[in-house]
Amino acid sequence: MKVSIMNYKIKQLEKSDIKQSIEIWNDIVSDGIAFPQTELLNEETGLEFFNSQSFTGIAYDKNSGEIVGLYILHPNNIGRCGHISNASYAVKKDKRGHGIGELLVKNCLTKAKELGFKILQFNAVVAINTSALKLYKKLGFTQLGVIPKGFLLKDGTYEDIIPHYIEL
């Protein structure tokens, strides 16, 4: 069943959102095919992690309140490169294909600009993440090349990564 993107809104993470957010995040970390992290979050480390970001956005269903996705936004570097931001996105598995990822990325672009960032850069888009690659192309991101075997998959094999950026 296709759900209208109009059913979803994005807000800043609140403490009451931590448990559902950690579940979504950990699901992707456990898959071992998209996020570089290997350690799962618990409520303590999750609260610390999400609160350490410049912004953590939560996509939720306006009718049920269910959290269906999230993003984290933070500086990619420091000092003279501190104007470049980095972000990661997570959509609940059973909610993929409903436009939530696009909603998250668009909100992130706006928020990054509001926070004074000039560029949004993705360091490690895994080549097998075809949905993300298609979305970033649609939204106007530029591919920076390919880093062969730059990502260690959960099964112990390596996959290429494709860094991207967009000027804000």
Give the positions of each predicted feature.
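Terminal substrate-recognition subdomain of acyl/acetyltransferases
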Residues: 1-6, 89-90, 147, 153-168
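A short beta-loop-alpha structural element at the N-terminal edge
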Residues: 7-21
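Helix-loop element at the rim of GNAT/NAT acetyltransferase active sites that forms part
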Residues: 23-39
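Acetyl-CoA-dependent GNAT
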Residues: 34-94, 105-106, 111, 167-168
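Conserved acetyl-CoA-binding loop-helix of GNAT-fold acetyltransferases
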Residues: 91, 97-114, 133-138
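Conserved GNAT acetyl-CoA-binding A-motif
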Residues: 112-125
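Conserved active-site tyrosine of GNAT-family acetyltransferases
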Residues: 136, 141, 164
